[in-house]
Each structure stands twice: as C-alpha cells, then as structure tokens.
C-alpha cells in the first residue's frame, strides 16, 4: 500500500492553484515551471506570454488562477506577489497502439502531468 500524501498547509500570505490534467510530459512541463520559479507574478506572466512552448498557455492560466485566489480568497496585494513554488507531478498515461509490420503492434504512451503553483506575498523591502 502506498503512503497517503499529506495535504500542504498554506501560510497566511500564500495562495495556491492546481491543474490536474495537462496533456504533456512532466519533463516538458518542468521546463516551463523552472522559468517562472521565484519571479514576481507580472514578470512570470510576461515570460509565459512570450514563451514558444505550447504548454506555457496552460501554465499561464494556472498562474492567473493562483493570483485570483490570492486576491479574492486571501486578500493579498497582487502587486507584491511572487511565484514561491511551481512544481510538477506525473499523472495518468493514456495508452494507444500503433500497428506495425507482420501483424505486430507497438505501444504509444501519451503522458499527462499536473502542476501546482504557489504564490506568496513579499514585503515592501524585498
């Protein structure tokens, strides 16, 4: 039996957004997540808008969701928000087959990923 994961507790100055089913591999998604980690949210949105990666559009939506959660649910100032964490996880793998020569078949795996973005309010001095 697998060990149950504990839910992450957010501090009072944090907000989070999760996207569970993104149709890309975790490796490709992590390239985009690395590019926004630690940036101010406005800078991160610009990075994602002008990124040439296909999945950057979905990560941008998730970041907007985290910003909205911070503003509406936690009453945080969106001008002082920083992308504190952006981490990627594996999800299910859709399996398909590809017909090959002599009646054989090969397996095609189409991976799904999930991303969690945590934004944190940074003080005025930072």
From Swiss-Prot:
GO terms for biological process: translation. The keyword rRNA-binding applies. Pfam families: Ribosomal_L22. One of its GO terms (molecular function) is structural constituent of ribosome. Keywords: Ribonucleoprotein, Ribosomal protein, RNA-binding, rRNA-binding. The keyword Magnesium does not apply. SUPFAM superfamilies: Ribosomal protein L22 (SSF54843). Coiled coil: none annotated. GO terms for cellular component: cytosolic large ribosomal subunit. InterPro entries: Ribosomal_uL22 (IPR001063), Ribosomal_uL22_bac/chlpt-type (IPR005727), Ribosomal_uL22_bac/org-type (IPR047867), Ribosomal_uL22_sf (IPR036394). This protein binds specifically to 23S rRNA; its binding is stimulated by other ribosomal proteins, e.g. L4, L17, and L20. It is important during the early stages of 50S assembly. It makes multiple contacts with different domains of the 23S rRNA in the assembled 50S subunit and ribosome. The globular domain of the protein is located near the polypeptide exit tunnel on the outside of the subunit, while an extended beta-hairpin is found that lines the wall of the exit tunnel in the center of the 70S ribosome. Part of the 50S ribosomal subunit. Belongs to the universal ribosomal protein uL22 family. This is Large ribosomal subunit protein uL22. It comes from Phenylobacterium zucineum (strain HLK1).
